[in-house]
Amino acid sequence: MGFITKAIPLALAAASVINGAEILETRAGVQTLADKYIVVMNDGMSDKDFDSHRSWVNRTHRRRLIRRGAKAMGGMKYTYNFPTGLKGYSGHFDEQMIKEISKRADVKYIERDARVQINAIEQQDNVPSWGLARVGSREPGGTTYYYDSTAGEGTTAYIIDTGTDIQHEEFDGGRATWGENFVDDMDMDCNGHGTHVSGTVGGRTFGVAKKSNIVAVKVLDCNGSGSNSGVIMGMQWATEDAQSKGADKAVVNMSLGGAFSQTSNDAAKAIAEGGVFLAVAAGNDNVDAAEASPASEPSICTVAASTEQDGKADFSNFGQVVDVYAPGDGITSAKPGGGSQVLSGTSMASPHVAGLAAYLIGLGKGGGPQLCDTIKQMAIDVIQNPGSSTTSKLINNGSGM
C-alpha cells in the first residue's frame, strides 16, 4: 500500500513518570528503535535555556561514557527547534541517561523513537488514471481534467517522503529541486514512492497543480524505511524553508505515518501553527485514523482514499479526524527514471489534496492551514459507506464541470 508504514492499532498507553517528565510508552507490536529516544522540552522554553540543557546532556553523556564505563551510545543526533516553539532532540542513550534526563524540570516528555516504512499493495505500469478527472468534475466517470490555467504557479510543495526524481520529465526540467536528506547519503529516490507522490501534486501530466514547484525532503531510504526522529527533522526543515520564502505560498505533503506518536503530532501542529498547509495520509489499515500519527493531529488536513466508483477504498482508515476523501485507488503518476506507474493507498490520496491546496493558493484563495476548511467547503457529498463517524466529502477543484 502507498501509505508509508503499517499503522499498528494503538492508543497512547499509560505513561510512566520518573520524578517529573513522562516517558511515553507504546503497546506491544510497535517497532521501537533500541535505546533511541525523542525528548521534548517544556512549552515556552527560551533558546538560551534550550542551549544550556543540551550542553548539560552532552557533558553528562560524555561523563557516563568515560567515567562510568557505560556502553557506547551515540548521544544526541537531531535537534528540533521549530519556529513556532516546539523544541526537543533525539538520540541514542542508555536507560540510566534517559532516567537522568527525565528528572529535569525543563523536560515535558520523552518518547521512544520508532521505525516507519513503506508497504506497497499494488503496482502496474503505464495504464490510464482517473483521479485527476474526478478532482475536476462533479460526476464520476469523466476522462478530462478541468482546471484554471494558473495551475498553482508561484507555489511550492514540500514532499516529505523517499525523495523525488527531480530530473523526471513531469517536472519540466527545473520545477523540482532537492531540499534535504535526513536518512542516507543518496540524494535520489531509489524507492519510487516519493516521485509518484510528487507527480500527483505537481506533474505536468499527472499533477493537480501543474505549475507548482516541488521540493524533495528525503526521510525514508531505498527500502522505504526511516525513523520518527528523522521524519520530524524533515518536518522542521520544510517549515523553516517555507517560512523563509513565504509560508502562505507553500504546502507540505506527508504520505507517511505510523502508530500514535505525541511527538509526531506536536511537530505536525507546529507546521500548521507556522502558517503552512499540511496534508497527511489517513493510513491504510481500515481502522480509525485517530490511532495513527500524524493523521490524528486535528490542526492539519487528514485525507482518506476513495475509489473510482466514489466508495471508500477498502484499505483506507476512517473516523472523525478525516477531513476529506480524495482519489487513492489505482492512481497513475511518475516513477523514477521516466514513465509512470500505478499505486494505491491513502499516500496517493493525500497529494491530490496538497496539489489542490497549491492550486487554490495560485487562484488567490488564501494560504495556510485554513485552506483545509476551504477544501472541505468546496468538496462534494458523494462518498458511499465512508466509515463510522466519517465525512462523505470528496475533494473538487470548483471548476464547475
Swiss-Prot record:
Glycosylated where?
58, 223, 253, 397
Q: Name one GO biological process term.
A: proteolysis
Gene Ontology CC: one annotated term? extracellular region
Where it mainly occurs, coarsely classed, is secreted
Which parts of the sequence belong to the Peptidase S8 domain? 129-401
User: Where in the cell does this protein reside?
Assistant: Secreted
Pfam families recorded for this chain? Inhibitor_I9, Peptidase_S8
Give any GO molecular function from the UniProt entry.
serine-type endopeptidase activity
Q: Which UniProt keywords apply?
A: Glycoprotein, Hydrolase, Protease, Secreted, Serine protease, Signal, Virulence, Zymogen
Q: The Inhibitor I9 domain covers which part of the protein?
A: 36-118
Q: Which Gene3D superfamilies match?
A: Peptidase S8 propeptide/proteinase inhibitor I9, Peptidase S8/S53 domain
Propeptide positions: the record gives 21-119
Keyword hit for Protein biosynthesis: no
Positions annotated as active site in the UniProt record: 161, 193, 347
Q: Might you give the EC number(s) for this enzyme? A: 3.4.21.-
SUPFAM superfamilies in the cross-refs? Protease propeptides/inhibitors (SSF54897), Subtilisin-like (SSF52743)
Question: Secretion signal: which residues?
Answer: 1-20
Q: Which family does it belong to?
A: Belongs to the peptidase S8 family.
Q: What does this protein do?
A: Secreted subtilisin-like serine protease with keratinolytic activity that contributes to pathogenicity.
What name has this protein been given in UniProt?
Subtilisin-like protease 7
The species this protein belongs to is Trichophyton tonsurans
